[in-house]
C-alpha cells in the first residue's frame, strides 16, 4: 500500500490518496502455452487514474464501490477517511459513498483516530456526524485510559457542544409562573 499526500504551501493537506496493493499472476493454458494475466486487488485500477501526469480524482473515486467488494476494511477505511477529511475535488455522489462507509465502520475509524492522537481529525469525525454520542463517551474513557489528557478535555468539550441535551427551562418556567397573581 502507498499513501500519497498533496499539500498546499502552508502545509495543509489538500488531498490524501491510498493506493492499495495488487497482485499479478499468469496462468498457463494447456499445451499451447497461452498465458492469461490475472489481477487481484483494486490497486491496479487506482494506479490507472492518471492522464498525462495529472491525477483524475473522479476516476479515483469511481473505484471505491468495486474496492468495497474486493478489499478489506484495513484498506477501505483509510481510502474513505482520507477522501472525506481532505476532500479536494470530491463530488456529492462520491462523498455520499465515502460517508456511508465511514458511518458503517465508525467504531474502527474512531479507534484509528484515537491511536493517532490528532485532535483536528477527531473533531472532524464528530462534527460531521460520523460518530454517535455513545462513541464520544467511549472515546473519553479510552483517551483517559491512555493518559491522553488533551484528548479527554477536547472530547468532553465536544460532547457538550455537539451532543448537548435540550434545556428544560420552558418546563420549569411554566411550573413557576407568577403571572397569575
Could you tell me what each predicted segment is?
Residues 118-126, 148-160, 164, 176-177:
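Ankyrin repeat structural motif
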Residues 45-49, 123, 135, 153, ...:
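Generic marker of "main functional regions" within proteins
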Residues 1-102, 107-129:
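Solvent-exposed loop and capping/linker segments of extracellular ligand-binding repeat ectodomains
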Residues 9, 99-114, 126, 134-144, ...:
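Ankyrin-repeat boundary/"N-cap" motif
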